[in-house]
Amino acid sequence: MPKNYIDSRGWKYRVMSGLGENAFKARYQRADHQGDVGWKGLATVPWRESREAAQADLDRLAEKKGWKEWIG
């Protein structure tokens, strides 16, 4: 089950697909945006060929940074 995260600033983080069939990356959305607007790729993680690998990157980063799980 994919997990989404939120930090102390209200920025949200989740894994999303990119262009192409096998392109996934963790992305963030600033607190002043809602819905599908304003999602940007995290520069600190690479593109991955599977959603699971990208989720593992995000999970490790969230644990390191102390982000909380976000249901959204």
Model-flagged regions — what are they?
Residues 46, 62-65:
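Generic low-complexity, intrinsically disordered sequence content enriched
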